[in-house]
């Protein structure tokens, strides 16, 4: 798969026009969020879930998006409460949030579901601490140990037929554990549950390209060629980096307590600048596009980056998402890879990204934010 190259020093004319049009209107971002939120409210099922009942993470993403919508509490409270109750009902004795699936060793994408559910439940403020602490135990016990390239990472399931970890699941796990770390103060007896953050960081670094045109970019995992393979000048074959995984690496490194001045973070952000695009998930085209928008926003917000090169990412991303919203308030990807033909999933991703596009302070830039 070929990757499009983009100019680094100047924003494209389309991006400038979109940002100018977006900035000139008083509330297109808030209007888009309200329309998307009302779509989610209308699509919630009677038992409180969204989409596939076997995948509590899909409901959790809807809850998370509603919690951060900014709409008056009385308009979203009941839907959030019903979603929270549904997710809590999927918690197993081992602390994970998932629906067992015998064909997958019984785990039912336990790591993925539990990480997303833990973050959403914490944001909701409506889940008992005991349930969240059990989920933290589940995630911590799912981190792979050892000394190989998988060590420190997370796969889809705690139990699987083969040893496996990838950057997407790892980023969700690290985000959930860092986001909820304050809960450990509530754990009785002075005990604490946490990850091996050094191992997690090593796992992320191992997936980052050190040289060549993709330097600073990150691959999905050490085995699966999601975006293809490439051979460097020494003849070494490796997996090609792409956009969403590079932002996942940035987010993960921030959670591992690296700041944007760290050379590893800077190199990843330079890759993001080099291949800046909101028309595609760089290196993957339309595959996983709405996941890409969400992880981009979360990573750049966590790194406290106000602009990527000349690109004001908040304004450009908000303008792009507003332009993609469908008349019924939803978003949907025509490419079904990673379940993105589901408008509930894409709408949740889009809302979470838009909610991070709100300016952090008057003037659009806090003292801690910088332009890359």
Outline where the language-model segments fall.
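Secreted/extracellular ectodomain signature
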Residues: 35-37, 84
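An alpha-helical repeat/solenoid feature that recognizes helix-turn-helix modules
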Residues: 26-35, 49-79, 93-137, 142-319, ...
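Short, solvent-exposed mixed-charge patches
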Residues: 370-372
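N-terminal secretory signal peptides that target proteins for export/translocation
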Residues: 1-8
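Bacterial N-terminal signal peptides
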Residues: 11-20
């Amino acid at each position: 798969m070929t990757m499009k190259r983009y100019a680094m020093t100047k924003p494209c004319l389309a991006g400038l026009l979109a940002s100018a049009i977006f900035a000139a209107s008083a509330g297109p971002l808030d209007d888009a969020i309200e329309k998307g939120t009302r779509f989610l409210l209308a699509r919630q099922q009677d038992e409180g879930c969204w989409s596939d009942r076997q995948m509590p993470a899909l409901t959790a993403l809807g809850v998370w998006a509603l919690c951060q919508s900014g709409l008056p509490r009385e308009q979203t409270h009941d839907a959030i409460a019903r979603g929270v109750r549904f997710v809590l009902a999927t918690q197993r004795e081992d602390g994970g949030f998932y629906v067992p699936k015998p064909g997958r060793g019984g785990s039912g994408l336990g790591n993925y579901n539990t990480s997303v559910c833990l973050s959403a439940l914490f944001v909701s403020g409506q889940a008992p601490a005991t349930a969240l602490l059990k989920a933290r135990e589940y995630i911590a016990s799912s981190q792979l140990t050892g000394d190989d390239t998988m060590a420190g990472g997370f796969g889809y399931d705690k139990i699987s037929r083969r040893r496996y970890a990838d950057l997407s699941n790892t980023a969700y796990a690290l985000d959930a554990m860092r986001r909820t770390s304050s809960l450990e103060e509530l754990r009785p007896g002075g005990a604490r549950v946490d990850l091996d953050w050094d191992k997690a960081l090593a796992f992320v670094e191992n997936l980052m390209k050190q040289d060549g045109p993709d330097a600073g970019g990150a691959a999905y995992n050490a085995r699966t060629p999601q975006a293809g393979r490439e051979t460097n000048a020494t003849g070494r074959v490796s997996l090609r980096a792409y956009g969403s995984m590079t932002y996942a690496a940035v987010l993960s490194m921030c959670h591992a307590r690296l700041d944007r001045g760290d050379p590893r973070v800077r190199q990843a952000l330079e890759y993001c600048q080099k291949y800046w695009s909101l028309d595609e998930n760089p290196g993957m085209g339309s595959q996983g596009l709405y996941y890409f928008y969400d992880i981009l926003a979360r990573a750049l917000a966590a790194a406290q980056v106000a602009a990527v090169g000349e690109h004001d990412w908040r304004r450009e991303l908000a303008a792009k998402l507003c332009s993609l919203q469908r008349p019924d308030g939803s978003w949907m990807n025509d490419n079904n890879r990673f379940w993105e033909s589901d408008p509930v999933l894409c709408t949740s991703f889009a809302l979470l990204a838009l909610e991070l596009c709100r300016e952090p302070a008057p003037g659009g830039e806090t003292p801690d934010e910088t332009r890359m």
